[in-house]
Amino acid sequence: MGKGTPSFGKRHNKSHTLCNRCGRRSFHVQKKTCSSCGYPAAKTRSYNWGAKAKRRHTTGTGRMRYLKHVSRRFKNGFQTGSASKASA
């Protein structure tokens, strides 16, 4: 039996498992590194030749819990504390 189609039926071991950072089944068990996000590297794996992949994972594709409020706060000068007294 060669390494082609018939041999694929005999494969039953998992080389990849779930990644703690991106959640995909791309974490290589023996290498201990994720083929999708590059975990445990500090920086997320990203390449210019994968333009569509960049588009899927870039800022703005998620909830942006913090970032979506920044522009409004910037417009008001990042106000902090209590309301100022009205001058009469």
Swiss-Prot record:
<dbReference type="InterPro" id="IPR011332">
    <property type="entry name" value="Ribosomal_zn-bd"/>
</dbReference>
<feature type="binding site">
    <location>
        <position position="19"/>
    </location>
    <ligand>
        <name>Zn(2+)</name>
    </ligand>
</feature>
<feature type="zinc finger region" description="C4-type">
    <location>
        <begin position="19"/>
        <end position="37"/>
    </location>
</feature>
<dbReference type="InterPro" id="IPR011331">
    <property type="entry name" value="Ribosomal_eL37/eL43"/>
</dbReference>
<keyword id="KW-0862">Zinc</keyword>
<keyword id="KW-0863">Zinc-finger</keyword>
<keyword id="KW-0687">Ribonucleoprotein</keyword>
<dbReference type="Pfam" id="PF01907">
    <property type="entry name" value="Ribosomal_L37e"/>
</dbReference>
<feature type="binding site">
    <location>
        <position position="22"/>
    </location>
    <ligand>
        <name>Zn(2+)</name>
    </ligand>
</feature>
<dbReference type="InterPro" id="IPR001569">
    <property type="entry name" value="Ribosomal_eL37"/>
</dbReference>
<feature type="binding site">
    <location>
        <position position="34"/>
    </location>
    <ligand>
        <name>Zn(2+)</name>
    </ligand>
</feature>
<keyword id="KW-0479">Metal-binding</keyword>
<dbReference type="GO" id="GO:0022625">
    <property type="term" value="C:cytosolic large ribosomal subunit"/>
</dbReference>
<comment type="function">
    <text>Component of the ribosome, a large ribonucleoprotein complex responsible for the synthesis of proteins in the cell. The small ribosomal subunit (SSU) binds messenger RNAs (mRNAs) and translates the encoded message by selecting cognate aminoacyl-transfer RNA (tRNA) molecules. The large subunit (LSU) contains the ribosomal catalytic site termed the peptidyl transferase center (PTC), which catalyzes the formation of peptide bonds, thereby polymerizing the amino acids delivered by tRNAs into a polypeptide chain.</text>
</comment>
<dbReference type="GO" id="GO:0030687">
    <property type="term" value="C:preribosome, large subunit precursor"/>
</dbReference>
<keyword id="KW-0699">rRNA-binding</keyword>
<keyword id="KW-0689">Ribosomal protein</keyword>
<dbReference type="InterPro" id="IPR018267">
    <property type="entry name" value="Ribosomal_eL37_CS"/>
</dbReference>
<dbReference type="GO" id="GO:0002181">
    <property type="term" value="P:cytoplasmic translation"/>
</dbReference>
<dbReference type="GO" id="GO:0005829">
    <property type="term" value="C:cytosol"/>
</dbReference>
<protein>
    <recommendedName>
        <fullName>Large ribosomal subunit protein eL37A</fullName>
    </recommendedName>
</protein>
<dbReference type="GO" id="GO:0000448">
    <property type="term" value="P:cleavage in ITS2 between 5.8S rRNA and LSU-rRNA of tricistronic rRNA transcript (SSU-rRNA, 5.8S rRNA, LSU-rRNA)"/>
</dbReference>
<feature type="binding site">
    <location>
        <position position="37"/>
    </location>
    <ligand>
        <name>Zn(2+)</name>
    </ligand>
</feature>
<comment type="similarity">
    <text>Belongs to the eukaryotic ribosomal protein eL37 family.</text>
</comment>
<comment type="subunit">
    <text>Component of the large ribosomal subunit (LSU). Mature yeast ribosomes consist of a small (40S) and a large (60S) subunit. The 40S small subunit contains 1 molecule of ribosomal RNA (18S rRNA) and 33 different proteins (encoded by 57 genes). The large 60S subunit contains 3 rRNA molecules (25S, 5.8S and 5S rRNA) and 46 different proteins (encoded by 81 genes).</text>
</comment>
<dbReference type="GO" id="GO:0003735">
    <property type="term" value="F:structural constituent of ribosome"/>
</dbReference>
<dbReference type="GO" id="GO:0019843">
    <property type="term" value="F:rRNA binding"/>
</dbReference>
<dbReference type="GO" id="GO:0003723">
    <property type="term" value="F:RNA binding"/>
</dbReference>
<keyword id="KW-0694">RNA-binding</keyword>
<keyword id="KW-0963">Cytoplasm</keyword>
<dbReference type="GO" id="GO:0008270">
    <property type="term" value="F:zinc ion binding"/>
</dbReference>
